[in-house]
Amino acid sequence: NDFAKLFNIQSFASLQDFLSSEDIDAVYVATPHSDHFICALEAIKHHKHVLCEKPLTMNAHESMILLDLAQSLKVFLMEAYMYRAHPQTLNILNQLSIFNETNEKILIEGSFGFQAEVSSDHRLRNPLLGGGAILDVGCYPLSMCKLIAGHLQDLPFAEPKSITATGRLDKTGVDLQSDAHLVFSDQIEAKISCAIDEQLLNRLVISSGDISMTVSDPWHCGQFQEGKSSIAINHASGLVEEISYVDQIGLFTREIEHASNCILNQKIESDVISHADTQSNMFWLDQWRQQMQIVCPKNLIKNSPVLESKAFLNQTNKLENVNLPGLDKLASRLAFGCDNQTSEVHAFTMFDNFYGSGGRIFDTAYIYNNGMGDKYLGQWINSRQLEKEIIVIGKAAHTPQCEPQFIRPQILESLERLQIKKLDIFCLHRDNSEVPVAEFIDALTEIKEEGLIDLIGASNWEL
């Protein structure tokens, strides 16, 4: 209230009151990282356009949900990397042609680091608030080198082929400092650094042999030097060229104006940082942090806002459902494979979206993901209380255990992992020409009579 009175602006008692206001068209989310997802999600649900600070969310699973919902509701959503809307960045991209003729390797180097003397519960050091150097400032050189590597290859942005990282962790578990090496192609690589306990050069250098481009202030673009910024170019001929720029508008003003113009032109994404670019950035931030073996509490489903988002209730019904003889449940014409989800949060994100789209069949197997396919699906089914609404296809007796005696114990183990009473459909995962089909059928008939399965099928059988 004091802040509102000081600047003569309206204040609200809650997020819901704020988002329910008909006077608000768009919101800028600048909370600690851990609250980006919920604030942006609620804003999008209320059909408010969103400019959200980087990183968009705590992980790539949360960002998938936001981007998908924004596109579905035709709401503008932009991740706020302020340097993307500044003319200096456009100047950098326009000067990359100096590397067109080089046959040598191109190295992109970027750093962003500062020394913060803060307590362990400060957002920079608190894992519950999304602390750490990578999420706070490492995202800048990561996003920039992907942008540059992309334009060097005539792409909007580039996907690294690999990332390796080293660094130091805080006693709180967050990363204090990290260096990462990214390989984009046989010719293009990047080395990036970030820190929250060490002042770094905070610059961008692109080099290849005798050719180089140096940007002394790539992130703030002269915002704190009276708007003055410059790019130094060393040509192969030895000529040194400086491209200067004086900004009289302001870094963050430009970002706000860019977002506003996008909204006024009825765009749902920015042309300086697309939704695909944002999702790619989030994915590689995840990979970088995994390289550092950082354990983030919010990446556990019990702590994740994905659990509370209940995105499965957003029914778009894109998929047609039909009656399936032998079952008293509706079946979608498409089944979701539960074989490659990498975590609980990933599984909940994907399963929620599939169910919300009208998907009702989930296909798992005893061998999938070393049993985690069953476990993740079971956690989701029971958390969302959907056992009576969906159809579970289970499979067992895969080679080399494709024999009747393995079927029942593997079904029982799958049911234990799934924490459900029975499989709606059971399929033998492989065939075995050395075992008579009748022996498989006899075993399955007994299991069906026990009430452990309803329908019987086959998968990967030779006809």
Tell what function each PLM region has:
Residues 1-46, 310-314:
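N-terminal glycine-/serine-/threonine-rich beta1-alpha1-beta2 phosphate-ribose binding loop
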Residues 26, 32-33, 37-84:
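Beta-strand-loop-alpha-helix segment that lines the small-molecule cofactor/substrate pocket
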Residues 26-28, 185, 260-316:
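C-terminal helix-rich "cap/oligomerization" subdomain common to oxidoreductases
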Residues 49, 76, 107, 331-335, ...:
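Structural preference for beta-strand elements that scaffold enzyme active sites
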Residues 83-163:
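Predominantly a Rossmann-like dinucleotide-binding segment in NAD(P)-dependent oxidoreductases
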Residues 170-175, 185-257, 267-276:
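NAD(P)-dinucleotide binding in Rossmann-like oxidoreductases
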Residues 302-390, 449:
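N-terminal binding-site loop/beta-alpha segment at the start of enzyme catalytic domains
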Residues 345, 352, 401-463:
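Glycine/proline-rich, positively charged
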